Regions:
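Divalent metal-dependent hydrolysis catalytic cores, especially in the metallo-beta-lactamase
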Residues: 71-80, 93-112, 139-147, 167-174
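N-terminal-biased segments
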Residues: 17, 29-31, 35-45, 106, ...
Length: 382
């Protein structure tokens, strides 16, 4: 029996845990020496342990069986299939999911920054590496990363990623350099996604620093419970919705979905409880400002209706998903495991099952499968 059991599941969020050489075979030779490799140096002892563990599993069936039994207990690089694509196929067999979107984790730290040449070369290398990681299993859907600071490069990079087989394109949930994300210069990028029937996605970490570190300076230190890699703490959690709520609201208010009615987007690993009140806020904002702002008057639909037609969100395990569906609709929310990241927990299905126990079967099928299918293809069989 798989973890999913007899439930049909598509997973909207999983990750590869990159090794230090993840980009090496894929980056343009003239950019290879410009990667900021020190960004991965802090993980060297853990990577050595993880690689040794994977080698042991390949040589020792008992060790492999033990790892399979701890499938959702081990996290990060220590998890089964964290960086080995053959093991990842086995992990997906055990999970029983029909497919999962696969995001990068740390590779971006090697090329992010103000050096635009390095940024785009590194992004292209990461996209190629993601495609290679997923290439051996059609259930693994690679997610590209495309910065928007240079529109022409963004179009070229998105085109390459889509042609190579990326199932979605992650964009930063920030302004595009000196431009807003709806600037006409970026219409070519949004048109590329729309015409290719490929969604854009936002992901936690894509909006820059969550909050000023001074908010943590309160003489009340807390434990580094995740080991340095992904330390989202309570105050960071409060700030997570700010970036996607603003970015997606700007797309709606500026009429992007009227210009590109086939465009779809997903908001991944940023929670979704905030969406219920955000829908009302969007509609109120239009009513309050449309007299003085022509773009708001020209919208063909209520802002909340664009959300329902074009956007999807992944709740965290433990959020009151049943109530959220009741308040906002069954078409908005998607299951995600975050495998093998620790935020997904050791039993996300149990937490979602508890939150959905009074929710009807059709709405549950949309949550576990149909809405992810709709994000990826524009249609759902549920």
């Amino acid at each position: 029996m798989t973890y999913a059991g007899d439930r049909q599941i598509l997973d909207a969020d999983s990750h590869v845990m990159e090794l230090a050489d993840f980009l090496d075979e894929h980056i343009d030779p003239d950019q290879r020496d410009r990667l900021r490799r020190r960004a991965m140096d802090a993980f060297a002892p853990l990577l050595e342990t993880a690689m040794a563990g994977a080698a042991t599993r390949r040589a020792d069936t008992t060790a492999a069986t033990q790892a399979e039994e701890r499938l959702l207990e081990e996290k990060g690089w220590l998890a089964l299939g964290a960086f080995d694509p053959v093991e990842r196929t086995r992990a997906l067999d055990l999970l029983g999911f029909e497919g999962q979107l696969v995001f990068a984790t740390f590779a971006t730290t090697m090329f992010a920054g103000r050096d635009v040449d390095r940024l785009y070369a590194g992004s292209a290398a990461q996209n190629r590496a993601m495609v290679e990681f997923c290439s051996g299993d059609e259930r693994l859907y690679p997610v590209a990363f495309v910065p928007l600071v240079e529109p022409a490069r963004a179009v070229a990079l998105a085109t390459e990623a889509i042609d190579e087989g990326c199932a979605a394109v992650m964009v930063p949930s920030t302004a595009a350099g000196e431009r807003g994300p709806t600037h006409p210069d970026l219409d070519g990028f949004w048109d590329t996604l729309s015409e290719a029937n490929v969604p854009f996605v936002l992901h936690v970490g894509g909006g820059g620093r969550l909050l000023d570190p001074a908010f943590h300076n309160n003489d009340m230190p807390v434990t580094d419970h995740l080991g340095g890699g992904e330390n989202v703490r309570s105050k960071d959690y409060l700030a997570i919705p700010h970036s996607p709520a603003l970015f997606l609201g700007v797309l709606i208010y500026d009429g992007l979905f009227d210009r590109f009615p086939k465009l779809r987007g997903g908001c991944i690993e940023q929670g979704a409880g905030w969406v219920v009140s955000w829908l009302r806020q969007l509609d109120y904002g239009q009513r309050a400002f449309k007299r003085t702002e022509e773009p708001l008057r020209e919208l063909e639909l209520a802002p909340s209706e664009y959300v329902r037609r074009h956007l999807k969100f992944t709740p965290y395990p433990g959020e009151p998903v049943g109530w959220m569906i009741e308040q906002a609709g069954s078409e908005l929310f998607m299951f995600s495991s975050d495998y093998p990241h620790p935020e997904g927990g050791k039993d996300p299905l149990a937490k979602f099952k508890e939150a959905l126990w009074t929710t009807g079967g059709d709405a549950q099928r949309r949550f576990y499968h149909g809405n992810v299918s709709e994000l990826l293809s524009g249609s759902t069989t549920d």
